[in-house]
């Protein structure tokens, strides 16, 4: 909009050829204040032309005069010494942002032409470097010098713009406008003028379809990303929304652009894929993608120099153009390789520390850059130096977690799209059903599942005898069916954050035998704890201690509760996996299991045989205090918001845990009883199918009135041993073994 009243001035020739290449109106520095950067030139009623100003001092441009080049005078229909009205002009916050400008391009002087190729991509970069912030009007002609080649004449053909007030809308649309201002990220296209001999090359030549810089309505299906809609939109809001506004408005608001994003989460969830799409979404310069370990070098100082080289181009452009500089994106994959916490890496070279220091200085140092965006990716956020994570550095930290069911459907749709397009997938395959069965699968594991199903389908059409033969009608016959997916799910692909089915099945090798009311009550109480852990109103953490005498079946009951919970993530923390571990290694192993559990929405951890985990020995007594303190902390630590964790611990020494003040860490304690009545034992014997009804009656008569106490595990082992003896000796053998094992007292209890 025009501001202040008009100055009556006189149009003259541009003082020098160099100034004419700026395509600006040249005025004396005393004619306008420093704040005035644009002017509205009016040579007559109803005629208005917007120019950028270049202020110079010296006698070559007298006060009250405006210098125009020949090209500018032709466009604005100005004659030398013509009086014109000149008003200061300011672009306000609602001014259109030019997202695309198309030029009709030809040699400025038709007599001096060349067949030398002009790289349109390099021309677009150079144009933005020279003219970012320049107002353009449809029909305006500019003089453009590209490197040391012939001068070009650029006539503005079309301008596409978006209103910055609509950026937050779900569908901001671009529209053609008459004039506006270009920014450092405007897409520049060059179209060869009719009958021109100009040799244009590159992607910025002619009309090409390219994404606008502002595109919040990102189509994840086409880009090959599924299940990350919320994360992608959050990143756009935090990191990119401020970059679509004019530099002057950003300066007035005092905004500092976000310079860094950290994407972290389990392996295979799409962090690298997402970073790649962020680069293409912005339509900025081609992002620089660097693997963390590539930065490290064997020569002293080279690692730091590699960091400096990544930022060199952005530094040069920042010095030349200041706030009008375009955006430079640098993507670090596996950033934990170079940004470990300082002082944590052994050795006296300190290479890792100096690399972190160099990166900190470049992102947010004394001479800070405002035209960069650093995207780091890692699955070990805990290893990264905390100074790198504060605001001003990698301040937007987005967890790319395991996809939910809706996200898994999107991912499966992406990976089965081509099969559906070419009718290579059977009609019985339902992605919604597969998504429901693949709890806690990452995106990479779902892709692996599709590949495994395809290989199963292809294998049906291969006949392998002495030679390998492929069915000649394979092209027509090949269909991937639901059975192929289920086979891959059962046999080929297991999620890294899924249930530890094999370990649970080992603990439940004999199943659960309901030998009496104590078992029923314990399972009911255990299921109440499971429901408590699942409940939305619960605190998110439920820990249960299942204690009882040795061989009473505690581990099997804990495994059974873990299976009945139907939690997608179930892990067993067993002393068997930590034989020979040092105390610190044991603590790290336990902590990793808990850290993995926090990544799943519903998790269950079975901590088997707690006293063995603590290295408890009764002679001494001796135990590992380091492991004890680690367990106490983890048993009480609340999982992240929105996550639920059920911890099932087993122990044969309640008295020891009480002395260690560990019982208070549990939400509830369940006691597992031994078998204590003849009816209990007979229920187990009946379930074993070892004795005939008559033999069971004989055993019942012999045990009547006797004192009993035996663990279910020991009783089952005894039954397995008796099974190997002669049938006619089994009853006598069983009773004698029961007495030997101390489970049965043969002295009759005298009644009172």
UniProtKB/Swiss-Prot annotation:
Nervous system and secretory tissues. ATP binds at residues 510-515, 550-557. SMART domains: AAA, CDC48_2, CDC48_N. One of its GO terms (biological process) is regulation of synaptic assembly at neuromuscular junction. It is found in: Cytoplasm. It holds the Pfam family CDC48_N. Binds 1 Mg(2+) ion per subunit. It catalyses: ATP + H2O = ADP + phosphate + H(+). Keywords: ATP-binding, Cytoplasm, ER-Golgi transport, Hydrolase, Magnesium, Metal-binding, Nucleotide-binding, Protein transport, Repeat, Transport. InterPro entries: AAA+_ATPase (IPR003593), AAA_lid_3 (IPR041569), Asp_de-COase-like_dom_sf (IPR009010), ATPase_AAA_core (IPR003959), ATPase_AAA_CS (IPR003960), Cdc48_dom2 (IPR004201), CDC48_domain_2-like_sf (IPR029067), CDC4_N-term_subdom (IPR003338). Its EC number is 3.6.4.6. Its cofactor is Mg(2+). GO terms for molecular function: ATP binding; ATP hydrolysis activity; metal ion binding. Required for vesicle-mediated transport. Catalyzes the fusion of transport vesicles within the Golgi cisternae. Is also required for transport from the endoplasmic reticulum to the Golgi stack. Seems to function as a fusion protein required for the delivery of cargo proteins to all compartments of the Golgi stack independent of vesicle origin. Homohexamer. Belongs to the AAA ATPase family. This is Vesicle-fusing ATPase 2. It comes from Drosophila melanogaster. The gene is Nsf2.
């Amino acid at each position: 909009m025009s501001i202040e009243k008009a100055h009556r001035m006189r149009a003259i020739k541009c003082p020098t050829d160099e100034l004419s290449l700026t395509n600006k109106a040249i005025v004396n520095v005393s004619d306008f204040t420093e704040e005035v950067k644009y002017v509205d030139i009016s040579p007559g009623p109803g005629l208005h032309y917007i120019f950028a100003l270049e202020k110079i001092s010296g006698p070559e441009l007298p006060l009250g005069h405006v210098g125009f080049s020949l090209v500018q005078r032709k466009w604005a229909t100005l004659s030398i010494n013509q009086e014109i009205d000149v008003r200061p002009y300011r672009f306000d916050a609602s001014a259109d942002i030019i997202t695309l400008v198309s030029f009709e391009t030809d040699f400025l002087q038709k007599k001096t032409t060349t067949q030398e190729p002009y790289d349109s991509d390099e021309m677009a970069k150079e144009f933005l470097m020279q003219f970012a912030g320049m107002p353009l009007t449809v029909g305006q002609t500019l003089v453009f010098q590209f490197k040391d080649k012939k001068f070009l004449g650029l006539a503005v053909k079309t301008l596409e713009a978006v209103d910055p007030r609509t950026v937050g809308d779900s569908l901001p649309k671009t529209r053609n406008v008459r004039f506006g201002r270009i920014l450092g990220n405007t897409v520049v296209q060059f179209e060869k003028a009719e009958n021109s001999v100009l040799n244009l090359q590159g992607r910025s030549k002619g009309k090409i379809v390219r994404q606008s810089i502002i595109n919040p309505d990102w189509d994840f299906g086409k880009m090959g990303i599924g299940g990350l809609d919320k994360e992608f939109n959050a990143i756009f809001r935090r990191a990119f929304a401020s970059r679509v506004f004019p530099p002057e408005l950003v300066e007035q608001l005092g905004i500092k652009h976000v310079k860094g994003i950290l994407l972290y989460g389990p392996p295979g969830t799409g962090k690298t894929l997402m970073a790649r799409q962020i680069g293409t979404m912005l339509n900025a310069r081609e992002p620089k993608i660097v693997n963390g370990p590539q930065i490290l070098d064997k020569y002293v100082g080279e690692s730091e120099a590699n960091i400096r080289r990544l930022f060199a181009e952005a530094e040069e452009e920042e010095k030349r153009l200041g706030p009008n500089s375009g955006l430079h994106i640098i993507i670090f994959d596996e950033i934990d390789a170079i940004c470990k916490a300082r002082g944590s890496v052994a050795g006296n070279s300190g290479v890792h520390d100096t690399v972190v220091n160099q990166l900190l200085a470049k992102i947010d140092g004394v001479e800070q850059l405002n035209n960069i965006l650093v995207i780091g990716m890692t699955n070990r956020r805990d290893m990264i130096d905390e100074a790198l994570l504060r605001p001003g550095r990698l301040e937007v930290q987005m967890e790319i977690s395991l996809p939910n069911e809706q996200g898994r459907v999107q991912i499966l749709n992406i990976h089965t799209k081509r099969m559906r397009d070419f009718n290579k997938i059977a009609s019985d395959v339902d992605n919604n059903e597969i998504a429901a069965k693949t709890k806690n699968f990452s995106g990479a594991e779902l892709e692996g599942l599709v590949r495994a199903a395809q290989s199963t389908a292809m294998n049906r059409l291969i006949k392998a005898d002495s030679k390998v033969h492929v069915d000649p009608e394979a092209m027509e016959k090949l269909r991937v069916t639901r059975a192929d997916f289920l086979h891959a799910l059962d046999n080929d692909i297991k999620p890294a954050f899924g249930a530890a089915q094999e370990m649970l099945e080992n603990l439940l090798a004999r199943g659960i035998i309901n030998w009496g009311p104590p078992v029923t009550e314990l399972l009911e109480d255990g299921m109440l704890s499971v429901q408590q852990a699942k409940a939305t109103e619960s605190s998110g953490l439920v820990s249960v201690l299942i204690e009882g005498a040795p061989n009473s079946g505690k581990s099997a009951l804990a495994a059974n509760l873990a299976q009945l919970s139907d939690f997608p993530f179930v892990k067993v923390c067993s002393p068997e996996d930590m034989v020979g571990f040092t105390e610190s290694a044991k603590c790290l192993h336990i902590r990793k299991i808990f850290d993995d559990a926090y990544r799943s929405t519903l998790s269950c951890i079975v901590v088997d045989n707690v006293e063995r985990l603590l290295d408890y020995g009764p002679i001494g007594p001796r135990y590992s205090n380091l492991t004890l303190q680690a367990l106490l902390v983890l048993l009480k630590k609340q999982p992240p918001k929105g996550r639920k964790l059920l911890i099932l611990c087993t122990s044969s020494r309640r008295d020891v845990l009480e002395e260690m003040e560990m019982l208070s860490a549990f939400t509830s304690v369940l006691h597992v009883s031994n078998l204590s009545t003849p009816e209990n034992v007979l229920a187990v014997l009946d379930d074993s199918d070892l004795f005939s009804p008559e033999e069971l009656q004989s055993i019942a008569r012999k045990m009547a009135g006797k004192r009993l106490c035996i663990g279910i595990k020991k009783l089952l082992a005894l039954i397995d041993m008796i099974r190997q003896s002669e049938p006619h000796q089994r009853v006598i053998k069983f009773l004698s073994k029961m007495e030997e094992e101390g489970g049965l007292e043969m002295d009759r209890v005298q009644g009172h």
